[in-house]
């Protein structure tokens, strides 16, 4: 059963939109893209960042919106880069992250999907545990070439079914269960 309500994904990141669109389409929800730079506070909390972005998106467009904020949290460097993942990727990149790590390579991706309309503000979280590879492998965007999910020998960039196991998929699945039954 396909919902045909207008639901807008607001972001400046077209990669996140394309992944989210593919995932939500498979779950029965049509998504449209509004490219926009949203207000982003500096915070150690993905939830706080996501709430501000969702409210900003709704106030700009006056339409039901979802936004996504995520982070890569690496255990051996106290959860860094965490909510600063985008900035760190732009400045030091995957090579810089690989150069920081010695032995403990445990990491996790966390995604926060936030829905906002006139009366609702809802957060949906997804987490995927894994580790950081020793070298970049595969072709993908962001940290995909260095993140290896638990129970895999391949990086996200090498995995064909990433959209069925990612942190983003888990958060969007929770969102779709709520949205289709609200």
What do these predicted ranges mean?
Residues 2-8, 15-182:
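Anionic-ligand binding patches
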């Amino acid at each position: 059963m396909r919902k045909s309500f207008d639901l807008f994904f607001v972001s400046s990141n077209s990669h996140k939109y394309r992944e989210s669109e593919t995932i939500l389409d498979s779950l029965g929800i049509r998504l449209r893209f509004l490219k926009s730079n949203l207000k982003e506070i500096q915070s150690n909390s993905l939830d706080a960042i996501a709430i501000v972005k969702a409210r900003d998106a709704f106030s700009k467009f006056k339409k039901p919106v979802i936004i996504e904020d995520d982070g890569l949290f690496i255990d051996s460097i106290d959860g860094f880069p965490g909510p600063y993942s985008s900035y760190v990727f732009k400045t030091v990149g995957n090579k810089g992250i690989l150069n920081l790590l010695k032995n403990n390579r445990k990491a996790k991706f966390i995604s926060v999907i936030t829905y906002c309309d006139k009366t609702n503000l809802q957060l949906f979280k997804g987490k995927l545990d894994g580790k950081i590879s020793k070298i970049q492998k595969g072709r993908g965007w962001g940290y995909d070439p260095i993140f290896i999910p638990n129970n895999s020998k391949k990086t996200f960039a090498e995995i064909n079914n990433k959209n069925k196991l990612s942190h983003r998929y888990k958060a969007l699945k929770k969102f779709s269960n709520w949205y289709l039954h609200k």
